[in-house]
């Protein structure tokens, strides 16, 4: 086992609505990401993926609140820290974030170099314009971006170039952990390919030490990440290698996700598309027992009464279901 860059232990965070209702969008989540490795997080919209990302970044501003658990980056515990302290001492150097709709994160009235200056001076107020420009030019060159981009306004850049620019600015200080939340959404296929290549280059060059990639597209994670974690209704329901998650999903929800999308990989091209019925539960009042029970074709009475923990198959593969591995495989084989 390699050096652990990010470890999350039993993390729980919640939203408090204006009616004082608790919504546990991240419910007892644990994970590890080793140096040089990438973790993919998949699931439908509303399953807690982006809230988990915000929680890992320490973005605890109302209505989001930290409840319990630990977040450890390269041996340093950041859970429970004041958000302002996290911003000043952690963000950018220890952990960085590429938000959803990152193309809209750039102020259209400022040149790209100004965003770089803001990031660097947050940690080094004495940095000169020359030092900042030299560092930015070097990093942009490594990532295949022209230096001229630094002197351009966002409106002068294409959508794909904006996205790659946001990524470059986010990692300018070489963070140990990069969290990319839907970084290739809303892009054409060519731009998506360039963004994915850029993220791979970041890992291979050592500019970042590890990565979490969030998306609802399991096949995309297969091409980018080493391991995949599937979330549903704020909980982890399956975790394993990228190959296992895509080609051999075990949890009924993971199986349903893979059955509802077109997969270009050889061996899966001819599978019949099937939708996952229903919608995720309302987390203001989550169901007792298995949270997927109302949508599961294999549900039995015990599923709605018993809340099961994660079953461990080996050091990398776990899943949350009342059925054993053998029982699930038999059901899938029989087409039940």
Question: In which residue ranges do the predicted regions lie?
Answer:
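Conserved ABC ATPase signature
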Residues: 153-157, 161
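Charged, flexible cofactor/metal-binding loops and thiol motifs
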Residues: 241-336
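A short, proline-enriched helix->beta-strand linker immediately N-terminal to the Walker B motif
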Residues: 172-176
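P-loop NTP-binding/switch modules centered on Walker-like glycine-rich loops
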Residues: 187, 191-271
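Conserved ABC transporter NBD signature motif
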Residues: 66-78
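Conserved ABC ATPase "signature" region
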Residues: 130-148, 258
């Amino acid at each position: 086992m390699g050096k652990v860059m990010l470890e999350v232990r039993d993390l729980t965070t919640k939203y408090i609505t204006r009616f004082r209702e608790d919504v546990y969008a991240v419910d007892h989540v644990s994970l590890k990401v080793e140096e040089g490795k990438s973790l993919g997080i998949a699931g439908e919209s509303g399953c807690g993926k982006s809230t988990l990302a915000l929680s890992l970044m320490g973005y605890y501003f109302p209505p989001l609140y930290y409840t319990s658990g630990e977040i450890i980056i390269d041996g340093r515990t950041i859970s429970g820290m004041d958000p302002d302290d996290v911003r000043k001492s952690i963000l950018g150097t220890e952990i960085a974030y590429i938000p959803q709709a990152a193309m809209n994160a750039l102020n259209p009235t400022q040149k790209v170099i100004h965003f770089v200056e803001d990031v660097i001076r947050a940690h080094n107020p004495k940095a000169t314009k020359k030092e900042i420009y030299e560092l930015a030019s070097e990093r942009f060159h490594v990532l295949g971006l022209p230096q001229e981009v630094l002197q351009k306004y966002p409106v002068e850049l294409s959508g794909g170039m904006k996205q790659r620019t946001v990524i470059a600015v986010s990692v300018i200080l070489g963070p140990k952990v990069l969290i990319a939340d839907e970084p290739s959404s809303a892009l054409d296929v060519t731009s998506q390919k360039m963004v994915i290549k850029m993220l791979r280059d970041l890992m291979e060059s050592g500019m970042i030490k590890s990565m979490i990639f969030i998306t609802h597209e399991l096949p995309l994670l297969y091409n980018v990440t080493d391991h995949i974690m599937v979330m549903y209704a704020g909980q982890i329901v399956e975790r394993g290698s990228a190959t296992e998650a895509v080609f051999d999903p075990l949890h009924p929800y993971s199986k349903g996700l893979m059955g509802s999308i077109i997969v270009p990989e050889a061996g899966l091209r001819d599978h019949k598309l099937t939708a996952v019925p229903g919608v995720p539960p309302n987390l203001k009042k989550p169901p007792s027992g298995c949270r997927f029970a109302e949508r599961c074709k294999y549900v039995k009475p015990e599923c709605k009464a018993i809340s099961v923990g994660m079953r461990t198959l080996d050091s990398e593969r776990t899943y949350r279901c009342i059925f054993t591995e053998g029982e699930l495989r038999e059901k899938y084989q029989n087409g039940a």
